[in-house]
Regions:
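Compact alpha/beta protein-protein interaction domains typified by the UBC
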Residues: 23-92
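Glycine-centered motif in EGF-like
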Residues: 73-135
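Glycine/serine-rich phosphate-binding loop and adjoining beta1-alpha1 elements at the start
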Residues: 134, 139-345
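Hydrophobic/aromatic beta-strand patches that form the interior of the parallel beta-sheet core
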Residues: 263, 376-378, 423, 439-441, ...
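Glycine-rich adenosine-cofactor-binding loop
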Residues: 338-384
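Glycine-rich phosphate-binding loop and adjoining beta1-alpha1-beta2 segment
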Residues: 374-415
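A structured beta-alpha segment of the ubiquitous adenosine-cofactor-binding alpha/beta core
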Residues: 406-438, 444-449
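ADP-ribose/adenylate-binding Rossmann-like module
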Residues: 439-484
Length: 488
């Protein structure tokens, strides 16, 4: 196998280079006597790129890592599509790709062609400098090289009054885990839940919150800019180059009030969000620049030059942005906005056993109990050790009421769960009770219950009659059946 692959790569124009003969100062092992790399020069319209292939233990199922040893001088420090950290060439999305793992020759010939194509496309993207660059579609944030993480519990917008906190937790190893989390003022309960579920100390919220600015960026170009920025001056230079309106808004927001700590949240059109944490040296800026008379004409360029000064930004960090708002959490189960969102439905789940236990978790992931309307779980049985093998609950819940234990488990699963209640009794099959729900799910597996529910539901007029869903296993689990009864 090694000989076949060796000759294939040589035939593609690679030369085998022992590790000890590789250039010094690169991020590859250059000391091992047993290692070596396959190196090739690729010519593009922008110049020559030198690529080293790093082969893995099983080249059949793992494509090689492409390391950039050398690139044209004019591209150094600039954003090139598919090139990250200045040395990593992303020529394929390996976890999504498909190839004939039993044909090494064809596979590695394709790898060679794909590297050439990727480099050509990357160079063409830089030269064209368009804003709707297909080579960077949805990937712009991947080149940000974030230093810490910011989680958003609310959708970012110019109208959203976001406040951020830096939270910390000490791990069992003694190391400290840190993250920034931003939420609206009305999300205080969700924020506390978030901290508790992620094992952070609530005392972090006692610190003064960090002013968070949401800034829309509509760039006139993406590729080819100096990237990533390492200070506030470089951020402002980037904005001035690609979107002067966003540049002016950023400067205005930073100069508007005397605040030391800021998070700039950039909503880049067609891309994921980017964020920056910074601390301003207010003494350097000077009092005369704050609270300026609105009637006086301001000079954005002068203020930007001041903010970009060497001693103005005392601390600067690039933050990776992760959305954790309600819509994002539930989006996988809502391919269409008008279908699948259960957060607006009043739901009763009757039976919290084998079917009901797992069903409750799936309902939560479709929004049940995550809005203003309630999600009620009914069961008068307790969770016992013999239930463990077929239930979603754990040994921690032995002896507890199934409905209450399951409801608590759901509420602890995610911070947006807010209207979930476990009721430790049988569901009262009465017309006035049924009318309080939009959906009633029968997971008891008992035909008498199903028949009675269907009969009583039909005594209600259509406007207040819930949809009945009967779910049960048949033949000791050989088949699962679901019957949806809308009363017609």
């Amino acid at each position: 196998m090694k000989q076949e692959l060796h000759h294939t790569l040589l035939g593609c124009g690679f030369r085998y280079t022992p590790a000890k003969q590789m250039p010094k100062g690169i991020l590859l092992d250059t000391k091992s006597r047993r290692k070596g790399y396959y190196v090739k020069e690729y010519s593009t319209k922008g110049g020559v790129f030198v690529i080293a292939l790093v082969l893995w233990n099983d080249p059949h199922i793992q494509l090689p890592f492409a390391y950039i040893l050398q690139q044209p001088e004019q591209y150094k420090g600039r954003l090139l599509p598919h090139i990250n950290f200045g040395f990593c060439l992303c020529y394929v999305t390996q976890m999504e790709a498909d190839w004939n793992s039993n044909d090494l020759k064809s596979t590695y010939q394709d790898v060679d062609e794909q590297i050439q194509l990727t480099l050509d496309n990357s160079v063409a993207s830089v030269e064209s400098g368009t804003s709707n660059d297909v080579e960077l579609e949805g990937e712009f944030s991947a080149y940000w090289q974030s230093e810490e993480e910011l989680y958003l519990l609310a959708k970012p917008s110019r109208k959203a009054q976001l406040k951020a906190h830096l939270v910390e937790a000490e791990l069992s190893s003694g190391s400290i885990r840190r993250e920034y989390v931003a939420a609206c003022s009305e999300q205080s309960e969700e924020l506390v839940k978030w901290l508790n579920q992620r094992k952070f100390d609530e005392s972090s919220l006692q610190e003064v919150s960090i002013t968070t600015h949401c800034i829309s960026v509509k760039p006139n170009r993406l590729a080819g800019v100096n990237w990533p920025p390492s200070c506030l001056r470089e951020v402002l230079s980037w904005l001035k180059l690609v979107d002067y309106s966003a540049h002016a808004r950023t400067v205005t927001l930073l100069m508007a009030k005397r605040t030391k700590r800021h998070i700039l949240l950039f909503d880049v059109e067609g891309q994921d969000e980017l964020a920056v944490y910074l601390e301003l040296n207010l003494d350097v800026i000077g009092k005369r620049y704050f609270g300026r008379n609105a009637a006086r004409k301001r000079n954005i360029n002068n203020e930007a030059a001041l903010l970009g000064g060497k001693f103005v930004s005392a601390n600067f960090k690039r933050l990776g942005v992760t959305r954790a708002d309600r819509d994002t959490l539930l989006s996988r189960n809502q391919l269409r906005p008008d279908v699948g969102n259960l957060s607006q439905k009043r739901i009763a789940l009757i039976g919290c056993g084998t079917i009901g236990g797992y069903l409750a978790e799936l309902l939560l992931r479709s929004g049940a109990g995550c809005g203003e309307n309630y999600f009620h779980l009914y069961d008068n049985d307790s969770f016992k050790p013999h239930n463990f093998a077929r239930h979603s609950l754990t040994a921690h819940n032995f002896g507890l009421a199934k409905s209450i234990a399951l409801a608590n488990s759901l509420k602890e699963a995610v911070h947006i769960a807010q209207s979930i209640k476990g009721i430790d009794r049988q569901f009262p099959i009465q017309a006035d009770v049924l009318s309080k729900y939009d959906i009633v799910i029968d997971a008891t597996g008992r035909p008498p219950v199903s028949k009675r529910l269907a009969a009583v539901a039909r005594t209600l007029i259509a406007d207040i009659r819930p949809v009945l869903i009967h779910a049960f296993n048949d033949g000791n689990g050989r088949a699962s059946k679901v019957l949806v009864d809308d009363g017609r």
